[in-house]
From Swiss-Prot:
Keywords: ATP-binding, DNA damage, DNA repair, DNA-binding, Nucleotide-binding. SUPFAM superfamilies: DNA repair protein MutS, domain I, DNA repair protein MutS, domain II, DNA repair protein MutS, domain III, P-loop containing nucleoside triphosphate hydrolases. PANTHER family: DNA MISMATCH REPAIR PROTEIN MSH1, MITOCHONDRIAL, DNA MISMATCH REPAIR PROTEIN MUTS FAMILY MEMBER. The gene is mutS. This is DNA mismatch repair protein MutS. It comes from the Bacteria. Belongs to the DNA mismatch repair MutS family. GO terms for biological process: mismatch repair. One of its GO terms (molecular function) is ATP binding. ATP binds at residues 596-603. NCBIfam families: mutS1, PRK05399.1.
């Protein structure tokens, strides 16, 4: 920062700024927030503001400066927060009119991406995550300051931490050191480094020291930045990753759980399909259920019972949803009360919500499902609080809490007297206007008011000469009018303004006292919010089940899906046009090798199964005529091809990295979906890798797997791997054109119909004709090498190798030295890569 002549104000600025080097300091000067030096230069550029100079551009050391009006600062602050910056709000803590010299100032709040309370997406959480490394175990504390919720878990590796953060996509992450910061910078999420911690009884639910340390880091950060009561924070809830089906960011993206892959929007995702919730807090809970499907049969069954109860009783379902449509976001209303930012409209929304509770509870009297009965028991009507809010607040109060108009007549005798005095004074002034018009004969005479001159009598210049000398005292001359006052008018003005100021002050004091009273109900109101959120989600799942004709799945040890459907794709097709398919997997049939033409629906079939499995484990009904499913601990997917441009990884490297995750972390209780593995490299490399991966999964993991491939040669593996079965997606030729039937049948596909797909894409006719000629020549030559049919799982002692390199002795020598039985698929990939490089040099 440049050297400048330090006035008392600038000394104050430097002193405050030194404590907040990582935030833009919004320094209050009168009606503006001003920024100086580098803060001003960056903010002016980011927000396209005019950059000026505090001491004039001609000064020897001009001070860069920009500013925003305090009444519209929220707009600018939001833009900076969304860009990942922090903002420190520095307010005047003394009345400038009552202070001689420099006004005291202090930072009242630091707003960060993870603590921003305003302009929130209703159905999205705003997560702030703290990570603490305790002896190689990583505690994760995830909090949402806008609702007061927080969760704790422990992870065992940096890779697991990175996956967790990529899956959560929090708004901000706090770490203790540069090592973790370096690990997480690749995510692009705003990071803060902090070493201070603060103990809290809210961390009593922590399962280990790593979780406790992470929460204390989170709590210290909130205390330091928010500088206010955090009474709305709820006790942290610890969970084990193993309690839920694990879905990493890659799987969520491939299955389009939360965003459409095509548009990046919520529309077109599974979440969008399921979201029939009517409250914001229900929408947030639904997303969390989808992020963490259950891995306990009892929890799933309890939810299914509740959904079934609501599916069977459509009148109850409809009536409950109608009631919930009039329920506001209690979680965030309570948070605003705890923060001290709730206004009268917020409390009216809370009151209106509480007044719906007797009806909701009455409707739930007849339910049979245990979860619904528990919800009914947790619904307190808060009659005392509701009546107090009804008595205190008008139905449509203003947003501002300092300009009156909030408190209902009859709540405070003192306030009523002040308001009556103000009303009487204004009535006197209204009468004065009529009286003076008659007395002067000037019909255009009027009484006006502004904040500078107060009340005045205004007469046009043309009529001013009609006034008696000395009748009024001239106060202000305008271009076309004269403004006057009288002693009596000023006396009434003092009475009116005095009553108005006192009434506004009293209203504010009454409102603050009321808000503090509401704060004492924080914990039971948060329990009410949790119950209503769960009811809302269960209703939403019931609505979808009834509307889409879903069935209740049965939890078993095997997979048996009859006429299953893709939940999202079927909704964009005309009713009845989606082609449903069966799927069976059990202990003897654990893997399906899927072949079929491009565009025939192989990937859709795979995604369909995964989505049905997820729906089962969130407690939902599923799109099928019947379904029996096991509990999956995790779903791994490699579907689609995409380069990772940020880290410089090719399509093939991304493919292998994701495959490595599956083959090294999957268990026999996992579900693996691998689509067209090996297409990112040469034909023989890809084919060899695909076969090795299939064999490894079958022999070493035993996970239920769907493996689609364009290598038709792999279908011979059915003969040597007992747990593998071939299926194909059927297509037929009709009048020289391919017709995709989207039906999955046993056995292998005999053709890929690639040229037909090219025709559908409307490639030039000459190109298509040439492709047919080349294909005919290749097929007649029959030069395609076949996979060795003796390839087998581990019980086979020797595996013959393909003769891929006929003329390169060096490559052949390296190839013969490879011990394939001791290699995993990733090691095989590396070996093949080295062989390929050697062959290129030869």
């Amino acid at each position: 920062m440049q050297e400048v002549h330090q006035t008392p104000m600038m000394k104050q600025y430097f002193s405050i700024k030194a404590d907040y080097p990582d935030a833009f300091l919004f320094y209050r000067l009168g009606d503006f927030y001003e920024l100086f030096f580098e803060d001003a230069q960056i903010v002016a550029k980011e927000l396209e503001l005019t950059l000026t100079s505090k001491n004039g551009k001609q000064a020897e050391h001009p001070i860069p400066m920009c500013g925003v009006p305090h009444h519209s600062a929220a707009i600018y602050i939001e833009q900076l927060i969304e860009k990942g910056f922090n903002v420190a709000i520095c307010e005047q803590t003394e009345d400038p009119k009552a202070t001689k010299g420099l006004v005291k100032r202090e930072v009242i709040q630091v707003i960060t991406p993870g603590t921003y309370m305003a302009s929130l997406s209703e159905k999205e959480n705003r997560y702030l995550v703290a990570i603490s490394d305790v002896a190689g175990r990583f505690g994760i504390a995830r909090g949402d300051v806008t609702t007061g919720e927080s969760w704790l878990t422990t992870l065992s590796s940096e890779e697991a931490v990175l996956r967790e953060i990529e899956g959560l996509l929090p708004n901000e992450v706090i770490v203790e050191d540069e090592r973790l910061a370096d690990l997480l910078r690749q995510t692009g999420i705003p990071l803060s480094i902090q070493v201070d911690k603060r103990e809290s009884t809210l961390a009593q639910g922590a399962k280990d020291e790593a979780q406790r340390s992470a929460f204390e880091l989170l709590f210290a950060y909130l205390t330091k930045t928010q500088k206010r009561s955090l009474d709305h924070l709820q006790p942290a809830v610890a969970y084990e990753v193993e309690q839920h089906m694990q879905l990493d960011a890659n799987t969520a993206r491939n299955l389009e759980l939360f965003r459409s892959a095509r548009s990046g929007e919520r529309k077109g995702s599974l979440l969008s399909l399921l979201d029939e919730t009517t409250t914001a807090m229900g929408g947030r809970l639904l997303k969390r259920w989808l992020e963490q499907p259950l891995y306990t049969e009892q929890g799933i069954r309890e939810r299914q019972d509740a959904v079934e109860n609501l599916v069977d009783d459509f009148m109850l379902r409809d009536q409950l949803q109608e009631e919930l449509k009039r329920v506001y976001d209690i979680e965030r209303l309570v948070a605003k009360v705890g923060y001290g930012t709730a206004n009268a409209r917020d409390l009216v929304q809370l009151r209106d919500t509480l007044e719906r509770m007797p009806s909701v509870r009455s409707l739930l009297q007849t339910v049979k499902a245990d979860r619904l009965q528990q919800i009914e028991q947790n619904l307190d009507s808060f009659e005392t609080l509701s009546e107090q809010l009804r008595a205190a607040l008008v139905d449509s109060p203003p947003i501002s809490t300092k300009e009156g108009g909030m408190i209902r007549h009859g709540y405070s005798d003192e306030l009523d007297e002040l308001l009556e005095a103000k009303a009487n004074g204004k009535s006197w002034i209204a009468n004065l206007e009529q009286q003076e018009r008659i007395a002067t004969g000037i019909k255009s005479l009027k009484v006006g008011y502004n904040r500078v001159f107060g009340y005045y009598l205004e007469v046009t210049k043309a009529n001013a000469k009609l006034l008696e000398e000395g009748r009024y005292e001239r106060k202000q001359t305008l271009t076309n009018a004269e403004r006057y006052i009288t002693p009596e008018l000023k006396e009434k003005e003092a009475l009116i303004l005095g009553a108005e100021e006192k009434s506004c002050t009293l209203e504010y004091d009454l409102f603050v006292a009321l808000r503090e009273e509401v704060k004492t109900y924080t914990k039971p109101l948060q329990q009410l919010a949790r119950s209503l959120s769960e009811l809302d989600v269960l209703l939403a799942l019931a609505v979808v089940a009834e509307k889409r004709e879903y069935v209740r799945p049965v939890t078993t040890s095997h997979v048996q899906i009859e006429r299953g459907r893709h939940p999202v794709i079927e909704t964009v097709l005309p009713r009845g046009e989606y082609v449903a398919n069966d799927l069976t997997l059990d202990d003897t049939r654990q893997m399906l090798l899927i072949t079929g033409p491009n565009m025939s629906g192989k990937s859709t079939y795979m995604r369909q199964f995964a989505l049905i499995a997820i729906l089962h484990q969130i407690g939902s009904f599923v799109p099928a005529e019947a379904a029996e499913l096991p509990l999956f601990d995790r779903i791994f997917t490699r579907i689609g091809a995409a380069d990772d441009l940020v880290s410089g990884q090719s399509t093939f490297m991304v493919e292998m990295t994701e495959t490595r995750q599956a083959v090294t972390e999957a268990t026999s209780n996992s579900l693996i979906l691998l689509d067209e593995i090996g297409r990112g490299t040469s034909t023989y490399d890809g084919m060899a890798l695909a076969q090795a991966i299939v064999e490894y999964i079958a022999s070493s993991i035993g996970a239920k797997t769907l493996f689609s491939t364009h290598y038709h040669e792999l279908t011979v593996l059915e003969d040597s791997i007992p747990s593998l079965e071939n299926v194909h997606v059927r297509a037929i030729e009709r009048d020289g054109r391919v017709v995709f039937l989207h039906e999955v049948h046993p056995g292998r596909a005999d053709k890929s119909y690639g040229i037909h797909v090219a025709e559908l894409a409307e490639l030039p006719d000459s190109l298509i004709d040439r492709a047919r000629t080349i294909l005919s020549e290749l097929e007649s030559e029959a030069t395609k090498p076949a996979l060795n049919e003796q390839s087998a799982p581990p019980q086979v002692e020797e595996v013959s190798q393909l003769s891929l390199f006929e003329s390169n002795d060096a490559v052949r020598e390296q190839l013969l030295k490879l011990d394939l039985l001791a290699m995993n698929p990733i090691e095989a990939m590396q070996a093949l890569y080295e062989l390929q490089q050697t062959a290129k040099k030869g």
